[in-house]
Amino acid sequence: MTGKRTQIIPAQTSHLDAVTALEALTFPEDAISKRSFRRFIESSTADFHVLVADARVIGYTVVLYRNNTNLARLYALVVDEGFRSRGYGRSLLQTAEE
């Protein structure tokens, strides 16, 4: 991942507006709702991380886990169009795999 001021951190409720806006831009006809993103933050069976660059959310991942199994599903992986082809998606995926 390139960039000196980028970090991948667990999503917080303060990120919801930015994530919801990015989701709507990326998937205008099938966007995940703000309510669902809030549930992912609160859920013990979800990992929701955001990629932040200079205090701006530029990407995120959501991984959902099935109860009582070793199964996980990458539910969402988004990088802002203006930040693609810089390794950010790869970094988000690596974090999701951890």
Locate the predicted segments by residue.
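Acetyl-CoA-dependent GNAT
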Residues: 3-6, 10-84, 90-95
